[in-house]
């Protein structure tokens, strides 16, 4: 069963095309890496797949729903780690997750468990603005999994995570459908079964089995 089906996804910023005619089909439980240089369109594609942005044209179905019409319903089923963590710097790590619990209708008892999973129990009371870049990234990842989403959309989640970052991501991705943007081909090869290469907003060929991409 395909969790994501995209046809002709195109996005313009003014007179500049950021994404052009992208077709995708991603099955349940599949992990796909999106590769490309800066400005290739990776972030734009992931924001659209996370329902954080609308394409200028094209069709997108996620979990059988029209993603352009059912964004609110789908956001409860999608975990999104954006390119920037997007945390509340004055709130503690715990308070950031508790606030998200309130928005998503998640039990706050899950907060301590989630902080432990991402390795932040010892800094639970520290303001997010005082955390290191790697810790902030871990907190953003924790927020993305707090509501146990079926689909994870991760924009360079490995940034500043440290030596055990790949292990953390592998554990969190298990049993979920994942779209992951990264510059790290070794990480993509370890975590994903397929890759989509973007160049100037266009797909370079069709999504490929990763062992063919060097």
Q: For the regions a protein language model found, what residue spans apply to each?
A:
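Helix-to-loop junction immediately C-terminal to a conserved catalytic motif
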Residues: 50
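Catalytic Walker B motif of ABC-type/P-loop ATPase nucleotide-binding domains
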Residues: 152-156
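Conserved structural motif at the start of ABC-family nucleotide-binding domains
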Residues: 4, 19-21, 75
């Amino acid at each position: 069963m395909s969790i994501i089906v995209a046809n002709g996804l195109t996005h313009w910023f003014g007179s500049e095309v950021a994404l052009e005619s992208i077709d995708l089909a991603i099955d349940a439980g599949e992990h796909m890496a999106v590769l490309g240089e800066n400005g290739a369109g990776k972030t734009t594609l992931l924001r659209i797949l996370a329902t954080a942005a609308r394409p200028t044209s094209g069709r997108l179905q996620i979990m059988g729903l029209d993603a352009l019409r059912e964004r609110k319903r789908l956001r409860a089923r999608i975990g999104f780690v954006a390119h920037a963590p997007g945390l509340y710097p004055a709130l503690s790590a715990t308070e950031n997750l508790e606030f998200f619990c309130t928005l998503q209708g998640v039990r706050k008892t899950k907060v301590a468990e989630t902080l432990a999973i991402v390795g932040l129990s010892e800094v639970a009371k520290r303001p997010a603005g005082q955390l290191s870049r790697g810790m902030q990234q871990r907190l953003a990842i924790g927020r993305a999994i707090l509501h146990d989403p079926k689909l994870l959309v991760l924009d360079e989640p490995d940034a500043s995570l440290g030596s055990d970052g790949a292990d953390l991501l592998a554990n969190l991705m298990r049993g979920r459908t994942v779209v992951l943007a990264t510059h790290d081909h070794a990480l993509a090869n370890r975590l994903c079964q397929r890759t989509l290469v973007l160049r100037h907003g266009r797909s370079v060929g069709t999504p490929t089995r990763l062992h063919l991409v060097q």
